[in-house]
């Protein structure tokens, strides 16, 4: 059953990336990044649309060259979701994509160049009402900071971020968010905690270069979970060496587990043991695949026996408790007379879940359905 999170979020200012509000209590935006060649417009557009289909709020696109900037023009024309241009080294690329309707510019303080170049980007962003992300990364800190600190430290990442926050402040530009990413969980977490005390701007969270699908998901869940539980974070990206679509799914799963933002079904399922009366694992896997299209937030418990099944079903929108040949079915925590044949559980449960999703959706205001 859908419950509010007890987490009190950090107060922050509000910016907009396209039509997506960021900060000041807005839903935490989930984003990913394309891994296609940006000059391959067809492939990049296809990937952006795939990300949008699974719920991405924002997509970042790497724009490493002027050729990529020209391709970005056509990518933007063929997509609807807000796009962030990821800019490194050459500030002129930022100026070029600004002409093509980019929704946000990500610049890296470690390589974007001197203050005069940043000024050019800021003035362009101001003229076109484009927000900026100051994206600090432990792997690409400025040389003088590496000389000073010898290695990436929370203080080094903070100093890099604040150096550029100060530049934007002097230029009277407040439409920005900041990230201080690192591949080490503790380094990233402490960096964000320090930064959160220094500025009021929205924070974009991420554990950079987290790893493959399994290890990267775990590392991201631990690091981002620590920050989100403290109320820190306004947008996030799960960085995986995997299909970007998985980044969106994991991102929503993390938010869902903290009851910060729910999209789709929260499956509560036992790991199964010799007491199970039906194959829990295959049942859950099949239902997850079949029901990916449901965006309504709801809890479904699938428990293989009567030890924990009834208790979990009491706090679920739909609950299933394994029984001998026939399994018990619960709706809104109430045991129903109807029982499910263990040989046909998936089809029966899918029908009930879809019907229940429509009922739950009708109870939630339309503007809150994707919060």
Swiss-Prot record:
GO molecular function: 4 iron, 4 sulfur cluster binding; 4-hydroxy-3-methylbut-2-en-1-yl diphosphate synthase activity (ferredoxin); 4-hydroxy-3-methylbut-2-enyl-diphosphate synthase activity (flavodoxin); iron ion binding
Cofactors (names): [4Fe-4S] cluster
InterPro entries in alphabetical order: Dihydropteroate_synth-like_sf, Enolase-like_C_sf, IspG_bac, IspG_bac-typ, NO2/SO3_Rdtase_4Fe4S_sf
BP term (GO), one: isopentenyl diphosphate biosynthetic process, methylerythritol 4-phosphate pathway
UniProt pathway annotation: Isoprenoid biosynthesis; isopentenyl diphosphate biosynthesis via DXP pathway; isopentenyl diphosphate from 1-deoxy-D-xylulose 5-phosphate: step 5/6
Disulphide bridges, residue numbers: none
Reactions listed under catalytic activity: (2E)-4-hydroxy-3-methylbut-2-enyl diphosphate + oxidized [flavodoxin] + H2O + 2 H(+) = 2-C-methyl-D-erythritol 2,4-cyclic diphosphate + reduced [flavodoxin]
Protein function: Converts 2C-methyl-D-erythritol 2,4-cyclodiphosphate (ME-2,4cPP) into 1-hydroxy-2-methyl-2-(E)-butenyl 4-diphosphate.
Family: Belongs to the IspG family.
Full protein name: 4-hydroxy-3-methylbut-2-en-1-yl diphosphate synthase (flavodoxin)
Gene: ispG
């Amino acid at each position: 059953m859908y419950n509010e999170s007890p987490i009190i979020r950090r107060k922050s200012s509000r910016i907009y990336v396209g039509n997506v509000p960021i900060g000041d209590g807005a839903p935490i935006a989930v984003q990913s990044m394309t891994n296609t060649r940006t000059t391959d417009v067809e492939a990049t557009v296809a990937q952006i649309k795939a990300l949008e289909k699974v719920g991405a709020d924002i997509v970042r696109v790497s724009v490493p060259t002027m050729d990529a900037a020209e391709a970005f023009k056509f990518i933007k024309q063929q997509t609807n979701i807000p796009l962030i241009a990821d800019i490194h080294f050459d500030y002129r690329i930022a100026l070029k994509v600004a002409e093509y309707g980019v929704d946000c510019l990500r610049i890296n303080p470690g390589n974007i160049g001197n203050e005069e170049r940043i000024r050019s980007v800021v003035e362009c962003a101001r003229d076109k009402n484009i927000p900026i992300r100051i994206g600090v990364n432990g792997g690409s800190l400025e040389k003088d900071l590496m000389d000073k600190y010898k290695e990436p430290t929370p203080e080094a990442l903070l100093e890099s971020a604040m150096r550029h926050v100060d530049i934007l402040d002097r230029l009277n530009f407040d439409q920005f968010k900041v990230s201080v990413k690192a591949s080490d969980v503790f380094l990233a977490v402490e960096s964000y905690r320090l930064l959160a005390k220094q500025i009021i701007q929205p924070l974009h969270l991420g554990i950079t270069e987290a790893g493959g699908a399994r290890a990267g998901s775990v590392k991201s869940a631990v690091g981002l979970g620590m920050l989100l539980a403290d109320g820190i974070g306004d947008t996030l990206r799960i960085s995986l060496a995997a299909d970007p679509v998985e980044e969106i799914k994991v991102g929503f799963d993390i938010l869902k587990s903290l009851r910060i933002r729910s999209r789709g079904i929260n499956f509560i399922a036992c790991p199964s043991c010799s007491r199970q009366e039906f194959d829990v694992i295959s049942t859950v896997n099949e239902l997850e695949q079949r029901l990916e299209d449901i965006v309504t937030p709801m809890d479904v418990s699938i428990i293989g026996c009567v030890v924990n099944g009834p208790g979990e079903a009491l706090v679920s929108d739909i609950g299933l408790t394994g029984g001998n040949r026939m399994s018990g079915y619960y709706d809104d925590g109430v045991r129903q007379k109807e029982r499910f044949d263990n040989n046909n559980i998936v089809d029966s449960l899918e029908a009930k879940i879809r019907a229940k999703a429509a009922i739950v959706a009708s109870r939630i205001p339309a503007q809150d359905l994707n919060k």
